[in-house]
Amino acid sequence: GKGIFVTGTGTDIGKTYVTALILKKLREASVNAGYYKAALSGAYRNADKLVPGDAAYVTSISGLPVSPEQLVSYIYEPAVSPHLAAQLEKRPVDMKKIQSDFHHIATQFDVVVAEGSGGIICPLRMDSSPIMLTDVIQTLHLPILIVAHAGLGTINSTVLTAAYAKQHNITVNGIILNQYDSNNLMHRDNKKQIEHLTGIPVVACVKSNETELSVSAELLLHLCNDIS
């Protein structure tokens, strides 16, 4: 199968929203595409079960007929960064579980779209055996897509994210600008500068409240790499 890892330039940048649109586009093109997230904090309670909000959103938008709990390895209730939530709940993240869960999902789908937590610098476990989000991306051998905001400040955060990925030997296959307005001169210029400064193509621009990606499922598949 194939896979891609979606990260963002920060929290609340629209990473989950864009991930859902990617999956929706693939599934509407009859691609058997699935979702995976290693760790999610800030889950909400529904009756007596914890619901991983991001995964629930993605499955509902993309029409993925799987219960969201099955797509996330670690679900934490506290709305703090994952390593702190794990400490509070005394349930540290284990890389072997992440690997086996991911590969289990990869056997059920032809394409897996994995999603990070927060930005690219995200501690998942900070103790005597620390795990960073970049360790997960490297261990799963996935290339990344960076979701960035189209507006003011995006050049700095996007170029930094791409440079950090490169420094950690992570391949960036593309950048997606969210809340993009083609009539906005700065948005158009940001796109140009980001491509120039990173050498990475902006593969899609997503307008505010877009329900459909403007790029083809073929292009999205082309951005995925074979899962090893």
Range-by-range predicted roles:
Residues 13-14:
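Conserved glycine(s) of the Walker
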Residues 126-150:
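Inter-motif core of Ras-like GTPase G domains
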Residues 126-134, 159-162, 187-192:
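Charged helix-capping and loop-helix junction motifs
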